[in-house]
Amino acid sequence: MTIPSTVREVIDRGPFRDDWSSLADYPVPAWYQDGKFGIFVHWGAYSVPAFGSEWYPRNMYVQGSPEYEHHREVYGDHESFGYKDLIDRFTAERFDPQQWAELFRRAGARFVVPVGEHHDGFAMYDCSRSEWTAVRRGPRRDVTGELAAAVRARQMVFGVSSHRAEHWWFFNGGMAFPSDVRDPAWACLLYTSDAADE
């Protein structure tokens, strides 16, 4: 099997076309229609600064933004301490998947969907294709897998959301000034559309 090299190839191989009428034919699962209430979780290395939002990793490289200024004040210059350095500070030391799942169940949730990988390229699950995973860096545990087991044990549906499609441009701001984004040693995480053009 060959790996598709373009988005068009992926679409052509899939069950849908890239238009709304094709998606409209998709049968919505009964568990979703009947679920009424679910929990979507945004949590990852971007929560370390406890500043801004899950877009901190992008905005910290946008000169003049509140996140950029916060990062400089708290961590120093972006060349010496960038987003990659926040990842190992993301320890998830108080993460208790059983406690989370029980809270979700008591709230009446029927399904739980965490973001498995945000635009930052850091996978919250075990993955053989990257060293930038919660199993290999930061918490050094499969937080998504642990949460999945706890949620399913309580008879709730578990899903995972991937936001990686926007990773290719997410760190572009760091190319405009001296930052770790410009260092080829970190290209496997801090990928930019500029790198795609080379």
Residue ranges and their predicted role:
Residues 2-122:
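N-terminal structural segment of carbohydrate-active enzymes
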Residues 27-28, 32, 71, 140-142, ...:
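Catalytic-domain carbohydrate-binding cleft regions of carbohydrate-active enzymes
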Residues 79-96, 126-142, 181-190:
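The substrate-binding groove and active-site-proximal loops of carbohydrate-active enzymes
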Residues 100, 143-147:
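A general structural detector for well-ordered alpha-helical segments in enzyme core domains, enriched
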Residues 107-140, 170-176:
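Aromatic-lined carbohydrate-binding/catalytic grooves of carbohydrate-active enzymes
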Residues 148-152:
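Surface-exposed amphipathic alpha-helices with a cationic face
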Residues 157-169:
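Aromatic-lined carbohydrate-recognition surfaces of secreted/lumenal glycan-active proteins
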Residues 191-196:
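Conserved small/polar residues in nucleotide/adenosyl-binding loops
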